[in-house]
């Protein structure tokens, strides 16, 4: 997705190449995630670029599917074969507050790919993301601490069925006791 027509475009559209905020082709990424006061985990994210859908699989018995076109989040419980659908779209890593454009920084090589750092301050936190020219997030740093960094990246077609509720899964109860669609 290009940033044309957004507040970020004022600064970024002047760059020699357009900045993509989401991957523009299918990709499978393994990240090391380090949250303060928590153990480090490995998370797999697979993008179906044509449909703007991402599937995140962590170390537990669940997966989360974010459908940006439908503004829908689906949580799959792999252990009991159930799912919960919620409305919403998560913020993108490169998503500063309105009116705050990120500054272009240095280039890096992470997981064998070149990326460019983009930095901005939000509230009191300084965020830096390193993005490839085709929109793959390779690193996210907040206040000098690396929260997320790619360990491996594989460009390959992703099977669309990975981004759907599997057959045989039942709706889970939503918070408040009602069924998730």
Identify the role of each PLM range.
Residues 28-34, 40-44, 109, 119-121, ...:
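Ser/Thr- (and often Asn-) enriched beta-sheet segments in non-cytosolic proteins
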Residues 30-40, 53-58, 91-99, 117-121:
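Short, solvent-exposed secondary-structure boundary motifs
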Residues 6, 21-23, 37-39, 48, ...:
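A generic structural signal for short, solvent-exposed coil/turn residues
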Residues 43-95, 126-127, 136-153:
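An acidic-aromatic
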Residues 2-53, 157, 161, 165-181:
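N-terminal leader/targeting segments and the immediate start of mature chains
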Residues 24, 93-141, 169-172:
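Extended beta-strand-rich segments in extracellular/periplasmic secretory proteins, especially
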Residues 27-33, 74, 78-91, 100, ...:
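Mature soluble domains of exported/periplasmic/lumenal proteins and thiol-rich metal-chelating peptides
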């Amino acid at each position: 997705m290009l940033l044309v027509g957004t507040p970020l475009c004022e600064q970024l559209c002047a760059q020699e190449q357009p900045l993509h905020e989401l991957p523009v082709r299918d990709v499978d990424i393994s990240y090391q995630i380090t949250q303060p006061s928590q153990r480090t985990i490995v998370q797999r994210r697979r993008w179906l670029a044509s449909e703007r859908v991402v599937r995140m699989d962590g170390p537990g018995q669940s997966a989360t599917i974010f459908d940006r076109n439908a503004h829908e989040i689906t949580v799959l419980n792999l252990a009991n074969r159930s799912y919960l659908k919620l409305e919403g779209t998560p913020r993108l890593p490169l998503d500063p507050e309105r009116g705050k454009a990120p500054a272009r920084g240095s280039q890096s090589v992470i997981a064998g790919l070149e990326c460019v750092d983009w930095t901005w301050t939000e509230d009191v936190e300084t965020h830096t993301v390193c993005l490839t020219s085709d929109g793959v997030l390779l690193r996210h740093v907040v206040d000098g601490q690396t929260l997320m960094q790619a360990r491996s990246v594989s460009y390959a077609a992703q099977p669309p069925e990975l981004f759907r509720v599997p057959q045989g899964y039942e709706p889970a109860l939503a918070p408040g006791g009602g069924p998730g669609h």
